[in-house]
């Protein structure tokens, strides 16, 4: 059995070397005393079988064996269709992946250079090397291609990156404190690049265009909502101004009513005093009438009692004098009350005039403030309209 099989090449699939080859280097490189041992080892290695028979006994785990199976092929993972001798032909999926990879690397050269400086291999260089290795597989030995490909990991299908996931982690961390406008400027893509991407990857171009339209719609909704809120604020402010004016008018009316009420109270007091005076006068007149009746009815006996008549006259005159003094005092009181009323009326008129002046000044000040606010709002609206026209024009141009 061993004699029928041809001996395996000593150096891993290469033709038998000369005595000065690599496999005989043990005899030459070793010391002089150990030449026979080296020849014996080379002879034993040459007699080893390619597929030794399996022994029944303790079996090692597969993880300890470093041999590769014979049926292993990397052509399906790399997208190669056909045999290696027919030449490398890539599938449509790998072409689309390579084109998307090329576009991504054109857009983000800065991130690729930073990763290359750190020591990580870029995606394009790795794929180019694998393409060169698979392309030269038609002329070279398949075992060499397997060994060269085994050194690197497999190339798997790479999904196209979206606009949100195309940024590196470092860029995201650095741009975290920046405004939204800078991020939108980084993410935005020109119309020419969109046209090129539509030719290469129409699905991605449609997705980007739909995202832009949705963002524009959301911005329009926000602006409309802001306009509605501003209008509501303006209406509420106008209502507040009108209510404040009405309140000032009501305060004026209440002040006038309080003044009139005070005047009416003073008039009532004077009327009561006059009523008391008239009552006293009526009583005095009644007494005089009674005295006159007594005098007219007792003329005859008066001649007899002359002394009593003289005493009655003296009493009557004394009563008249007392009544006159009372009337004079009451008239003096009335004059004082009238003067006090006039003074109070003058003071009230002055106070009303001052209050009216103050209210007019306040009303003028409020009107000036309202005019200033309206001017500021008009300026803000003009600025916002100008800012809105610019992106709408840019969208139309796009």
From Swiss-Prot:
Keywords: Activator, DNA-binding, Nucleus, Transcription, Transcription regulation. Residues 203-224 are annotated as: Basic motif. Residues 125-148 have a biased composition (Polar residues). It is found in: Nucleus. Residues 7-19 have a biased composition (Pro residues). Coiled coil: none annotated. Residues 201-264 form the bZIP domain. Its main location: nucleus. Residues 229-264 are annotated as: Leucine-zipper. GO terms for cellular component: cytoplasm; cytosol; nucleus. GO terms for molecular function: DNA-binding transcription factor activity; transcription cis-regulatory region binding. It comes from the Eukaryota. Gene3D superfamilies: 1.20.5.170. Residues 1-46, 112-150 are annotated as: Disordered. SMART domains: BRLZ. Putative transcription factor with an activatory role. Belongs to the bZIP family. This is Probable transcription factor PosF21. It comes from Arabidopsis thaliana (Mouse-ear cress).
């Amino acid at each position: 059995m061993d004699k029928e099989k041809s001996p395996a090449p000593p150096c891993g699939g290469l033709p038998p070397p000369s005595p000065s080859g690599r496999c005989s280097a043990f005899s030459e490189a070793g010391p002089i005393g150990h030449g026979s041992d080296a020849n014996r080892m080379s002879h034993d290695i040459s007699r080893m079988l390619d597929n030794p028979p399996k022994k029944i006994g303790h079996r090692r785990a597969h993880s300890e064996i470093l041999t590769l199976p014979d049926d292993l092929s990397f052509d399906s993972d790399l997208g190669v269709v056909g045999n290696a001798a027919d030449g490398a032909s890539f599938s449509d999926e790998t072409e689309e992946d390579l084109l998307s990879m090329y576009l991504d690397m054109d857009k983000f050269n800065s991130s690729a250079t930073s990763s290359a400086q750190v020591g990580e291999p870029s995606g394009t260089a790795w794929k180019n090397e694998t393409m060169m290795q698979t392309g030269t597989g038609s002329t070279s030995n398949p075992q060499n291609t397997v060994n060269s490909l085994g050194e690197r990991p497999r190339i798997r299908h790479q999904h196209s990156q979206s606009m949100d996931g195309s940024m590196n982690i470092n860029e995201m961390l650095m741009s975290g404190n920046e405004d939204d406008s800078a991020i939108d400027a980084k993410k935005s893509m020109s119309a020419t690049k969109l046209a090129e991407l539509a030719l290469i990857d129409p699905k991605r171009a449609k997705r980007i265009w739909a995202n832009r339209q949705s963002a524009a719609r959301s911005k329009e909704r926000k602006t409309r909502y802001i306009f509605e809120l501003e209008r509501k604020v303006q209406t509420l402010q106008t209502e507040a101004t009108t209510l404040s004016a009405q309140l000032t008018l009501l305060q004026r009316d209440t002040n006038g009513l309080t003044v009139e009420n005070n005047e009416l109270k003073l008039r009532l007091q004077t009327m009561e005093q006059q009523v008391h005076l008239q009552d006293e006068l009526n009583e005095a007149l009644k007494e005089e009438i009674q005295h006159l009746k007594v005098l007219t009815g007792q003329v005859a006996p008066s001649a007899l009692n002359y002394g009593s008549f003289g005493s009655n006259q003296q009493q009557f005159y004394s009563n008249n004098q007392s009544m006159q003094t009372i009337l004079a005092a009451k008239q003096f009181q009335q004059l004082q009350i009238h003067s006090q009323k006039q003074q109070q009326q003058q003071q009230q008129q002055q106070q009303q005039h001052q209050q009216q002046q103050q209210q007019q000044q306040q009303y003028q000040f409020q009107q000036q403030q309202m005019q200033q606010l309206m001017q500021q709002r008009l300026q803000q609206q003009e600025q916002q309209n100008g800012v809105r026209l610019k992106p709408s024009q840019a969208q139309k141009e796009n």
